Structures are given as structure tokens and as C-alpha cells.
């Protein structure tokens, strides 16, 4: 698979690699996400890391596998979809996210994500 910003983001998220995610994200990121319970926003890398690792995939959530990553161009945007296997004290789950993003200066400057939630396999 050819590397893309979106697929690199998905791999770094699966590894919970905040250093790599910070390299991929523009300092002026415009991020919005939608989960099954609410909408989320971040406007800088610190807010985004807090959202990703304190709210979406907390310490108790171990990403044990990457089931799928696919990306494609949608006109001037990239679309990336990824599915993770996640384990936590409540059991084993699949989590899928679909994201659209734009790039500036080689980094993600705009991103919209929709999440399936933690679903039983």
C-alpha cells in the first residue's frame, strides 16, 4: 500500500505514537470528530493528543491489531478508513473510523472523523 498522510495517521494512532502523530499534524490543525455520544473538536496538537489518548483510546484501551487501512483521493481531499481490534476491561471490540483530511506544508491541517464506536466483533 502506498503511504499517505491518512494511512500514516492511522498507523501512528494504532501504535499510540503521540510523537509521530505530532509530526503528521499541522500546528494549526482544524479537527472535528463525531462518536456515538458526542462531537469533538481540537485546534492544536495538544488538544488533539488529549482527545485521542484521554478520551477515544485511553490507557485502558489496548489496540491489539490493525484490521484494515484504506485511503483514496476525493478531489482535493484524502479519505482514509481504518479498523482496529481493541481490548479493554470490558472485552474485545472493533473500532472503525472514516476520516477526510487536507494537507498543508506536508502535514494534516484539516480533518473530519466519524467513529463507529466500540463494537463487539
Language model regions located:
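Alpha-helix C-capping/helix-to-loop hinge sites
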Residues: 12, 32, 86-87
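A solvent-exposed, acidic/Ser-Thr-rich amphipathic alpha-helical stretch
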Residues: 18-20, 26-73
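A beta-strand edge to alpha-helix "cap/lid" segment located at domain peripheries
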Residues: 50-121
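Soluble or luminal CAZymes and related metallo-dependent hydrolases
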Residues: 1, 5, 48, 93
